[in-house]
A protein has these predicted regions:
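Terminal end segments
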Residues: 471-539, 628-743
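Second-shell loop/turn segments in exported
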Residues: 60-63, 109-123, 358, 368-374, ...
Length: 743
């Protein structure tokens, strides 16, 4: 329940005491840190990957925090600073973020969540924070003044902050604006009272912040022994995120407790994908409808009240004030008023309606615990037993094990709603309790596919119904509101086609498939494009050059592919100009063979001509090689790049940012700059033979420290379509050891 400003101030005072106790516990525990440090050994291999071996799980968590801080200390501390709502105070950026963190009491609620965790996992979170602090204390004089020691509450607050932005999102606000119009500004008729400090519908993320990317997600598949040369399952996964998200690899070993190799993101205290000697899994983003926006009818007789179940209820207001650093370095305050109903915080408001947001995501405080428990499981039954606890609020899970099982599980903390045909994707009626949910679906009620006859499962962020073309999951057996996505996009279509196209795969076949630069979109529309160009009477020089470039292009975005730059420019402008660009739209009866063709040949010709002129002007030729324009760049390394957005139907997903010279870069635009780019970065392939074999690649290296050789030592492998072996067994680690030490 929202509080008045006075009560909020009181809660802040109470929290300060709680935070003081948390910090005091670290101070009192300082004498124990050296003991934990002596209980853990970090062995860095020749790619800088830490293999953390500890006597206890608590010591292992301490070592994980320390090793992460060695590689990404500033990034971790900046994330936690933002989650505290203090970004603007120190940097002058992120004011909207800080307002939202204060609105949602992020630090206070995270401290409470920490106390609610099971005792053992609470110790692990605190130990991870202690490991980060150990590094900070050792390097205090070398770190900026804004770097602060952290608490276990900070670790949880970072996760919660991400969920807050998902729930109170600019994307939702924009969709409501499209449907209901831009709301009145303060002082205009219909605006709420007491808005001199602003109002909640102004909020969201900073204008400079990136919107949620439609390509965010991953590729994943698992092959059963019936579809592999070795007769054993193979698991492949590669997430797609911005390269500044900083995937990070490690192995955590506590004899008799855990021995897991995998990846996570900087600032996260557990590994979220990978394998142990028994099993492995990877995740891809799904689209569960975990959040509802309730349209509340405002009471015309009573300002700032709404009608619910026939009664008038007040909207409660909360004034949020943050500190922000001005350009001249001076501190200033920023104040904004937000509103809340009994159904949730008001994300948007019009003269007649207020829109309250309610979600399962924000309070999923056992998220990290869920992944940690999964990493300790030894077989399918144990894995499913952990999943049934429903600790992880989202994600498709693609699983394989040494016993020969493969499993796809569409996972979510999904509300149990009235399945009466209501479209829950944006706003739902909020005038009664009819659509207000209380309970969640059990995991056993969600879509899954275990050991299909086809011998494979795949997910490239597609709806669960298309996990296998030969073993479809029937959507009619599940509530209609489970999955927001309806269509099968081109990226999962090419995955299905490639998997279906080979009877059996070796591990080398799987590696080659991962790095294919084939573009499915080109195969679907290029025949129509060439036909339209060749039908032009008295063709211009641009059309002739376009025909030659498109006709000879290999339909790939390999570094040496000529014509791909031209085609991309053509498609981007054509599809932006034509609302329905395909001659045959996507058809659920032909989910992996549509869409196809071009709906408007005249527009296609016009946009191709303009694309020829554009590529000539910018690059000198319509047939410039893809790798002459697209670069993988880190420090002094500058290599031809390949890959493109998955929206073109690519399995090799890489997106680039433009530098000042017109080149497109994934990596660093200038030396020592933060990474840019998006898509393939971490790739893992696991074959469940005895002994287990695994390979991976981390495009931008294990460390963001520019002076570290491990900040760029894998980009050449990545550009060359190679994976490096994962050293999982003790003998292999020792044979490839760079250094060994205690924190």
């Amino acid at each position: 329940v929202i509080r008045t400003p006075l009560r909020s101030a009181r809660r802040l005072v109470l929290l300060a005491a709680v935070s003081g106790l948390i910090q005091q516990s670290y101070s009192k525990g300082a004498d124990k840190k050296p003991d934990l440090a002596q209980e853990v050994t970090i062995r860095r291999d020749t790619y800088g990957i830490p293999h953390i071996q500890a006597r206890t799980e608590e010591a292992a968590a301490f070592g994980l925090g320390y090793a992460q801080a060695e590689d990404h200390c500033l990034q971790i501390c900046r994330l936690y600073l933002s989650a505290r709502g203090e970004e603007a105070k120190y940097f002058g950026t992120g004011e909207e973020n800080d307002l939202l963190m204060k609105l949602y009491d992020n630090q206070q609620e995270s401290a409470r969540d920490l106390s609610r965790l099971p005792s053992m996992f609470r110790k692990l979170v605190n130990a991870y924070a202690g490991g980060v602090n150990r590094y900070i204390e050792q390097h205090r004089t070398q770190l900026p003044a804004w770097v602060q020691t952290i608490t276990g509450a900070d670790v949880l607050a970072d996760r919660r902050a991400g969920s807050v932005h998902q729930v109170f999102s600019r994307e939702t606000i924009r969709e409501l604006e499209k449907k209901y119009g831009v709301p009145p500004k303060p002082g205009e008729p219909g605006a709420p009272r007491d808005t001199s400090a602003g109002s909640s519908f102004d909020a969201g993320q900073d204008e400079s912040a990136s919107d949620l990317d439609k390509d965010e997600g991953s590729n994943a598949f698992a092959l059963s022994g019936s579809k592999t040369v070795s007769g054993k399952p193979i698991l492949l996964g590669n997430p797609h995120l911005n390269w500044n998200s900083l995937y990070w690899e490690a192995q955590v070993t506590v004899p008799g407790k855990i021995d897991f190799f995998g990846s996570t993101l900087a600032g996260i205290p557990v590994l979220r994908a990978g394998f142990n000697q028994h099993l492995g899994w990877v995740t891809t983003n799904n689209s569960p409808d975990s959040t509802d926006v309730f349209a509340l009818k405002l009471d015309p007789q009573n300002p700032d009240h709404y009608l619910f179940a026939g009664k008038s209820r007040p909207l409660v207001w909360k004034e949020i004030t943050i500190e922000s650093k001005s350009q001249d370095g001076k501190a200033r305050t920023v104040t904004r008023v937000y509103w809340e109903s009994h159904l949730g915080k008001i994300i948007y408001r019009t003269p007649n309606k207020a829109f309250a947001v309610k979600s399962t995501l924000i309070n999923a405080f056992r998220y990290y615990e869920g992944f940690y428990r999964l990493s300790k499981t030894k077989n399918l039954n144990e894995f499913l037993s952990v999943m049934r606890k429903n600790l992880v609020p989202t994600s498709n899970f693609t699983y394989a094990d040494a016993e020969g099982n493969i499993l796809y599980l569409w996972n979510a903390q999904i509300p149990r709603r009235a399945d009466d045909g209501t479209d829950y994707r944006l706003d739902v009626p909020g005038e009664s309790a009819k659509y207000v949910w209380i309970k969640l679906h059990k995991v056993d009620e969600l879509p899954r596919l275990l050991n299909p006859k086809s011998g494979y499962i795949q997910n490239c962020n597609n709806p669960p119904w298309y996990t296998s073309l030969r073993d479809p999951i029937n959507p009619k057996e599940y509530p209609s509101y489970l999955e927001a996505e309806r269509e099968l996009a081109l990226r999962p279509q090419i995955a299905l086609e490639m998997i279906e196209g080979r009877e059996r795969f070796s591990i080398e076949d799987v590696k080659n498939l991962k790095f294919t630069t084939r573009m499915l979109l080109a195969e679907r529309v290029k025949p129509d494009l060439l036909r339209a160009l060749r039908d032009v009477r008295d063709p211009s020089e641009e059309i002739k050059e376009g025909i030659d470039a498109i006709d000879t292009w290999d339909n790939r975005v390999a570094a040496d592919s000529k014509g791909a730059v031209l085609f991309q420019r053509f498609w981007d402008t054509y599809s932006a100009a034509i609302s329905k660009p395909f001659r045959i739209p996507w058809d659920p009866a032909k989910p992996a063979r549509t869409p196809e063709g071009l709906s408007n040949q005249a527009a296609a010709v016009q946009n191709l001509v303009e694309a020829v002129r554009w590529t000539r002007q910018r690059y000198g030729s319509a047939s410039i090689a893809w790798g002459d324009v697209h670069r993988f760049r880190f420090g002094d390394i500058d290599l031809p790049g390949d890959g493109a957005s998955g929206s073109y139907g690519l399995f090799r997903v890489v997106r680039f940012s433009q530098d000042s010279e017109g080149k497109r870069v994934a990596g660093q635009i200038t030396k020592d700059a933060a990474p840019v780019g998006f898509g393939d970065a971490w790739v893992i392939a696991v074959e469940f033979v005895k002994p287990i074999r695994a390979w991976s690649i981390l495009a931008y290296g294990e460390s963001s420290q520019s002076e570290s050789r491990h900040s760029s030592d894998q980009i050449k492998l990545f550009a060359g379509h190679e994976l490096r072996p994962i050293w999982y067994r003790d003998a292999d680690i020792r044979a490839n050891l760079e250094r060994e030490y205690h924190p």
